[in-house]
């Protein structure tokens, strides 16, 4: 299934993300300027702003829960999905290749709560509650690498289970030769790897377990 992703994030999501971003900037500014001499009403305002910041963060981390067919059956917060309860929730993976057949990998930030510092799929992220799979694919690709136009090819969906979570993974690939812009708080670096170089480094604690298992399946089935 091919679809040219040239749409933008729906206006409602754009507005909410912009509002959240601006609100958090204001909160951080107020906290850096806070002092003992500030009037009580100003301190109360800062406290309220900090409370709102926490609420925004919670709202931004609500995931859908699905059954094994992918049908949405409920919702849960990120912490609930990653605490070992094995609540099945959807994620997207995008594998990006260049004209040489090399595969782009991203090195996960040391700040990540799962598999910090390891090399991983080109793009990967959770589907937000109320969001469609292809909307999440576009959003995550824009957020992680700054890519706004690409043609994804659907490869497969499958269930991946680790010690702390259980995911319904929707896997895509695309070919892209442009520039990448990434948030260094989320990604340490990106690099194109040859397929042979990846094979040589499997099972060396360099890649995430999810990437390794997915890579081996895709190679074995000639999907990359």
Feature-to-residue mapping (PLM):
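Conserved Nudix-box catalytic region and its N-terminal flanking loop in Nudix hydrolases
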Residues: 80-92, 98-139
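Acidic pyrophosphate-coordinating catalytic loop
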Residues: 82-87, 114, 157-169
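Nudix hydrolase/Nudix homology domain
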Residues: 56-58, 129, 156, 163-224
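Acidic, metal-coordinating catalytic segment for phosphate/diphosphate chemistry
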Residues: 60-93
């Amino acid at each position: 299934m091919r679809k040219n992703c040239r749409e933008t994030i729906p206006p409602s999501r754009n507005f909410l993300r912009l509002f959240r971003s601006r609100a958090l900037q204001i909160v951080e500014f107020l906290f850096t300027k806070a002092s003992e001499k500030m009037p009580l009403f100003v301190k109360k305002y800062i406290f309220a702003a900090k409370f709102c910041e926490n609420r925004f963060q919670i709202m931004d981390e609500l995931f859908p829960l699905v059954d094994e067919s992918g049908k949405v059956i409920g919702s849960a917060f990120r912490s609930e999905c990653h605490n070992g309860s094995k609540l099945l929730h959807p994620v997207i993976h995008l594998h990006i290749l260049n004209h040489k057949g090399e595969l782009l990998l991203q090195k996960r930030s040391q700040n990540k709560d799962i598999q910090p510092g390891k090399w991983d799929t080109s793009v990967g992220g959770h589907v937000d509650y109320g969001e469609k799979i292809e909307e999440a694919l576009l959003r995550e690709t824009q957020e992680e690498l700054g890519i706004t136009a690409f043609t994804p090819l659907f490869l497969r969906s499958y269930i991946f289970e680790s010690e702390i979570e259980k995911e319904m993974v929707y896997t895509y690939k695309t070919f892209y030769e442009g520039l990448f812009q990434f948030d260094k708080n989320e990604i340490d670096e990106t690099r194109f790897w040859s397929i042979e170089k990846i094979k040589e480094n499997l099972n060396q604690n360099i890649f995430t377990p999810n990437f390794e298992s997915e890579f081996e399946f895709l190679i074995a089935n000639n999907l990359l």
